[in-house]
Amino acid sequence: MKNIQDAYGQQLLAQYNRQTATAEIIERDDWFIDFGSDAGSYFTEYEQWSPLEQQTIKRARGRILDIGCGAGRHALYLQQKGFDVTGIDNSPGAIKVSKSRGLKKALVRPLSDIDKFKPNSFDTILMLGNNFGLFGDAENAGLILEKMSRITTTGAQIIAGTRNPYKTDDRDHLEYHQFNKKCGRMPGQIRMRIRFRKTVGEWFDYLFVSPEEMRDILTATDWQIEEFIEQPEEANYFTVISKKSEGNSTADEHR
């Protein structure tokens, strides 16, 4: 990714360098446009996180890979707790910020290249900040989950956050669900790009799923739901996904 296309990274750099950083603009492929997250939210400390997020991150253990680490808020918290943490992001700007903030291991690396890590490198994979969405679609999720299986230890876990797309009464979003179905996509699959000031990112897919859809995605993989961490009234939720034991793995049957 060229720096000029790294709208997300430019936003983080502006915030880190104390410039006036507004929220990024999210543009969807149905021409829906909205403000995304305020830049400051990517720099929040543990005390500012939601109770559910605080509860979830306590499940992290061992050697940790933080996927989509951004400005490093999760990775830095765990590093300060004494964990061996590696952060990756496909945004050069994000990695520059996370390194500047003190993250010792931070790499510009897309999710598709996680198999460049050696086998048995990690005990926990983090996909917080709704980053289960980085799978993009169900088919790609299966491919990436297989790579995750190879780079993690026996008994490893994925700790992820996402959003239930069906917990909305917004007409624009409900119409987009139907638009997606007509395009042969999952209702919560968003094709989007990010704008910040004069910088425009590339189009990419981001996936929101219900708990039931997440279970379906994991069915033919080496992974299974261990626990959902959620509140009934909230659309955002977290999950702990555990690696199946060798005798309980179903992925080999589908390769």
Predicted regions and their residues:
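A short acidic, Gly/Pro-enriched loop at the edge of an enzyme's catalytic core
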Residues: 116-125
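Conserved class I S-adenosyl-L-methionine
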Residues: 61-70
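A short glycine-rich, Lys/Arg-flanked "PGG" loop and its adjoining helix->strand segment in the class I
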Residues: 141-154
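Conserved SAM/SAH-binding beta-strand->alpha-helix loop
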Residues: 91-92
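Short, low-complexity, charge-dense intrinsically disordered segments
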Residues: 252-255
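S-adenosyl-L-methionine
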Residues: 1-59
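Conserved SAM-binding strand-loop segment of SAM-dependent methyltransferases
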Residues: 102-114
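SAM-dependent methyltransferase
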Residues: 2, 11-16, 153-213
